[in-house]
A protein has these predicted regions:
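Catalytic phosphate/nucleotide-handling subdomain of diverse soluble enzymes
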Residues: 93, 97, 105, 319-397
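Active-site-surrounding "flap" and adjacent substrate/cofactor-binding loops of secreted or lumenal enzymes
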Residues: 89-120, 126, 149
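Bacterial Sec-dependent signal peptides at the C-terminal "C-region" and cleavage site
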Residues: 48-60
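Glycan-recognition and processing domains
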Residues: 410-458, 466-472
């Protein structure tokens, strides 16, 4: 990678973006309106006293040993690693469908080291976890969101979907929360944040309020709405796994902090409800959830297609694995994997959560084979290895515990459990935006054809496209985007594989009706060859 790539993109970006108080009642008699006022006044006093008493009730305290804390943290990291490796061969190969029982799911001692050697990109979710953990280790728990955003933008490994869109946004000057907001990131409802939120729960053991605080702040880098709730949910499950023993309890408690009306919350709540209806039949629960919640409306690659990277549906498969796995490590990651879709990310999460709940020492030995061979591995550009992650997490967890009223006496740790945490405010992505059409374009922007016009009817669009000719990695294309005769912006397309723009053209919240989109590539070159594959069109009403 040439040193000037980031600077070049930033400069290109700068060029584009430059264009009354209550009266005290008088009680003369206890009749008529005076009596009503007296009763109301008395009720207010009693309510205030009751609230005061509740506020001053002694907090419940939870205690565990230092060894147990470290064992659970290690179980969380190792569980992620194993779950990811186990489910990697099936990633998105079973889209919106169950992996049938007739299809064996293999695991052997060499699977983990072999995958990491031959296909390290499979573990990209864990790499992001390690990237953020490494940043916190160097800068502390008070690390600002912009520092984590900067670290993500300069990561020296490939990213996808919402994470890659966030990296691109940050590099062109869109800071969090804009980098993760759906108006700037079509993948805001994807499962990217829940794939990278594990570390938050592992450094916040039993501390649900701090977990939410960190997750809200850091999750805005790459997500909003349901995508943000997905990461908060997963982080809370990890945190709660330190203080509870039943997966069902983790899910019940994590749901309490989410807005009840969010699609994400409703989906997971229905998983729990159907688990109680069909406690021995996870496939029945899967069918019900897939039928009702299986349509992806945000991710341009998944709209009107079986591919589903949506946060709520993939979190549902994680939840099914946890509930029907009932604390058994092998059963948990197996069921999660058989739910299909983003199998490796989902099994990494369910494996990490159940690994935290059990602790490293209680993960069956057959799953730990091959672990020693990969412990020293560090992702490219990072100073942290899988082996170091638990000890760094422990250091940050102890700091977090002390900051939140906990005490560390020798090898005994205790901390207060905060109750009645208010649910998060409701935020809805793609509000009044329903996919109406997915249309093949098969257009090119090049030196020969440097411009094109696309007509559509609706309130928004997203175009899947890419650079298809091999060009120098430090080259950056700029494409003007004009809607109905007005410059709506410009898309920057870096050629470097780590910096590519995953969804180069999109715009939402247009007035309903017919529109004309004009695209023109700037500074044409013989090497320019940009494919415009298909357009997803949105409208205020769902497609019939």
């Amino acid at each position: 990678m040439r040193v000037n790539i980031f600077t070049k993109i930033q400069l290109a970006s700068n060029e584009i973006f430059a264009k009354g108080k209550l009266k005290r009642p008088s009680f003369v008699s206890f009749r008529g309106s005076s009596f009503i006022l007296f009763s109301l006044f008395l009720a207010i006093i009693l309510l205030a006293l009751n609230f005061s008493c509740r506020r001053h009730q002694p907090e419940e305290t939870f205690s565990l040993s230092l060894d147990t804390l470290l064992d659970k943290i290690k179980g969380g990291w190792v569980g992620q690693l194993i779950g990811c490796a186990f489910a990697a061969p099936y990633e998105h190969k079973f889209q919106s469908r169950i992996i049938p029982e007739a299809q064996p799911l293999h695991w052997s001692p060499n699977d983990l080291p072999s995958l990491l050697e031959k296909s390290p990109e499979i573990f990209d979710d864990l790499f992001v976890d390690l990237l953020f953990l490494d940043t916190l280790d160097k800068k502390g728990l008070n690390t600002q969101t912009k520092e984590l955003a900067r670290a993500l933008s300069r990561a020296q490994f490939a990213l996808k979907h919402g994470l890659q869109m966030a990296r691109h946004n940050i590099l062109i000057g869109l800071k969090p929360p804009r980098s993760g907001h759906w108006l700037h990131n079509p993948h805001a409802d994807d499962n990217d944040f829940q794939k990278a939120a594990d570390f938050i729960g592992l450094i916040s053991p039993g501390l649900v309020a701090p977990t939410i605080k960190f997750a809200r702040r850091w999750g805005e880098i790459m997500a909003s709405g349901d995508g943000l709730y997905g990461g908060i949910y997963i982080a809370c499950l990890y945190s709660l796994a330190f203080i509870h023993e039943r997966p069902e309890t983790l899910i019940e408690e994590a749901l309490k902090v989410l807005p009840a009306k969010a699609s994400f919350t409703r989906t997971i709540s229905e998983v729990l409800e159907n688990y109680r209806r069909f406690p021995e039949n996870w496939q029945q629960t899967w069918q019900i959830i897939e039928k009702k919640w299986g349509e992806d409306i945000g991710c341009p690659e998944g709209v009107f297609k079986p591919l589903n990277c949506d946060a709520k549906i993939n979190a549902a498969w994680i939840t099914i694995g946890l509930l029907y796995g009932r604390g058994d490590f092998a059963r948990t990651i197996t069921i999660t994997t058989r739910c299909g879709d983003d199998t490796d990310s989902n099994a990494a999460a369910s494996g990490g959560i159940v690994g935290t709940l059990l602790g490293f020492k209680r993960i069956p030995a057959e799953w730990l084979q091959g672990l020693k061979e990969v412990e020293k591995f560090s992702p490219r550009g990072l100073d942290i290895s899988f082996e170091e992650a638990p000890s760094i997490s422990l250091k940050l967890a102890l700091e977090n515990i002390k900051k939140n009223g906990g005490q560390i006496n020798g090898k005994k740790i205790s901390f207060p459990l905060k109750k009645n945490i208010p649910p998060l405010p409701l935020e809805i992505n793609f509000l009044d935006h329903f996919p109406r059409e997915r249309r093949e374009l098969n257009l090119r922007l090049s030196e020969i054809t440097s411009e094109t016009t696309i007509e559509f009817e609706g309130t928004g669009f997203a175009i899947n496209g890419r650079i298809i000719k091999k060009v120098p990695e430090d080259h950056t294309y700029r494409v003007a985007m004009v809607i109905d005769g007005r410059l709506a912006g410009a898309s920057i397309l870096p050629a470097h594989p780590f910096l590519q723009n995953p969804t180069p053209f999109f715009h939402y919240k247009l007035r309903p009706g017919k529109h004309r989109l004009f695209l023109q590539i700037g500074e044409p070159s013989p090497k320019a060859d940009i494919e415009l594959k298909e357009i997803i069109i949105y409208d205020k009403k769902p497609a019939k």
